[in-house]
C-alpha cells in the first residue's frame, strides 16, 4: 500500500505510516568509533556533526538510542596506560582491557552527551540526554577468545605490525587500509544495565548506551560479574540493544553510503535492498571484510529476523535521514 496514510503495530509500537515511510519509530543508532576521530580535538568536532544528524531524527518524532564504537579510542587508552607502566611499573600497574573500555565509554559518552544537549537546545527541543555506563555479558567459553579478530587502535604500516606481532600481539590487515592490533571479540549475551536504559528511554530521554560494545563481563561461579579481556563488536551489541528495547529500526552508520559486493574490485556493485537470505549468500561467498563490513551485515541480518516488521539500515552518517525515507543506504529486511 502506498500513497496513503495508515496505522500499523510493529514490535509493540503504534506508528503512523504515510507514503510507505514509517513515522515515530524507536531507532537504535550504531556509530562507528572511527567516525569519532583519532584524538580528543577531532572527537570534539566530530560529535557535533554527529549530534546534528541524530537530532534531525529526533525532530522527526523518532525515539533514538545511541550505541557507539571505540576501536581507535580503546587502543589509544591501552597504549597510553601501557606506556605509564613501562615508565614506572611500581606506580602504574597494567590496565585491564575492560577497564580501558569503561574509560572510553566515559569520555566518548561525555562528548556525545554535551553535543546532543547543545544540538537539542539549538533546535528548541527539551529532552534530557543520559549516558549509561554499560556492562555486557559474554560467555567465557566463547571460541572468539582463542581467535582474536576485533581491530583496535590506530592503523600501522606492515613494518610496525610485524614489530608488534614479534611482541606476541595479534595483528591483521583491515580492509586494505593498513594493519591494526586485534583482540578477542565474543558475542554479547545480555545487557546488564538494560532495565536502566529502558527506563530512561521510556521516560523520553535520549540515551547513549553500550559504548564500545559494552564493558565485557563474565559470570563467575558465584554469579558475580568479572571483567573479560575482550572488546565486543559494537554492531552486535547495538543489535542486542535494539532487540532488547523492542526497536523498530537498527541504523548502522559506516564510512560508505551503501553496502557493496566486490568492494574496491572490478565489478563493484552497490546494494539498496537485501533480504536476510540474500545477505547470507554474500556472507558465505566472502564478500564482506571481517572486522569491517561483515559484522555490520551479520548484525543487520540478525535484527531483521528477530521479529516481524523489523529492518536494519546500513549507510553513512549524513545519509541517515534519507536512508530512513528509503532514498539511499542498504536496507535489510524480510521480503
Predicted segment positions?
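C-terminal catalytic "cap/lid" subdomain
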Residues: 24-335
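N-terminal amphipathic/hydrophobic targeting modules at extreme N-termini
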Residues: 1-3, 10-13
